[in-house]
Amino acid sequence: MPETPSTPKTTYTVIFDANGGNGTIASISVEEGSEFTLPENTFTKTGYSFAGWATYADGNVSYSDKAKITVTGNTTLYAKWTAITYTITYEPNGGTNADGNPAGYTSGTETITLLAPSRQYFDFGGWYTDSEFSDSSKKNEITKGSTGNIMLYAKWTVAAENAVNAINSLPTGEHKIAVTGQMTKEKLNGVIAAIKGNSNGAKVYLDLGGTAIDFYDWQRCKFADCENLIGIVIPAIESPDKNNPIILIPDLMFEGCKNLKTVIILNSSGEYKIITFKDCTSLEYVEIPTSIVCIHGDAFDGCTALETITYKGTVEKWKQVKTDFKDSKYKLMSLNVQCENGTASGFDLIKE
């Protein structure tokens, strides 16, 4: 008898749909009744994790990734997605966070407007994703469609008239205090006294860059022996003499500030001299503007931690700065100088 021809097996096509995701997965052909393993998912969707496969776009998950299945007809499998919950971490920097600020979000969350924290005596300056508060990192809201865990830092300023109370309230630790507004001799000396006398021994980086102060009021302030001062930004101060360099940092102004690590001098109108930061043994970073045209030879004697100063001008401009003593025994002469277009040294200064 002739052999009965075998009946060919029916094959079905399985199609994979990203269901709002991105990428492609090739369709496959399978024989009716045969078990096969689903290919590994390679679809992606920003802000979502892959949850498995469904047989309807809005259906529940029927199969996990790489599951073994059989089909009874042509089939489309739809990727199912679970929104990732991202964390929002707040560093209020001494303040108290607002109750309404959420701890997390998903990419589908409606835009979140961040609420201001509170802090007695201080003014809130915004939330930032950078602890150094670069302008580009300021964040007022988290827009819908955002992804990723977020760390937010509160920036604070304090008005000059509130600075003493603000400093008195500081707990143990290191604190950067950015003061704004009109500063007077009386206010600044009060600030210095508060730093010296903080009952918790708080260490203060005093940023006066946002203040305005009269030159003579500035010169009548003494930071000497302020052991709790760890940094200072000296504001732009208008010179009362446009024709001659005058002294910006007089003798003894910072004497005994043995924990002072950072000094940044902002550029001012007019020309200035620096007399001394002698014996500031912890001083590590000094930033000098082009308005400084003369530095005393012994200005940094005893600053044993200082190796390099930063000059906010060119090498050529630095070499026009004058000094009264040019001798290798002075610390200034041995310092490296980082300029905008290269490096120089203290010994490049012109002897007056």
Feature-to-residue mapping (PLM):
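Secondary-structure capping and domain/repeat boundary segments
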Residues: 1-158, 351
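Surface-exposed or flexible loop/turn and strand-edge residues in extracellular/cell-surface modules
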Residues: 11, 25, 40, 66, ...
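Core hydrophobic positions of leucine-rich repeats
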Residues: 39-45, 53, 81, 115-119, ...
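Structural signature of tandem-repeat unit edges
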Residues: 104-106, 177-183, 201-215, 227-248, ...
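Extracellular/surface-exposed low-complexity segments
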Residues: 126-128, 156-158, 318, 322-352
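Beta-solenoid repeat scaffold
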Residues: 148, 190-206
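N-terminal segments that cap or nucleate solenoid repeat domains
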Residues: 159-195, 351-352
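Beta-strand repeat architectures
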Residues: 169-172, 197-199, 301-304
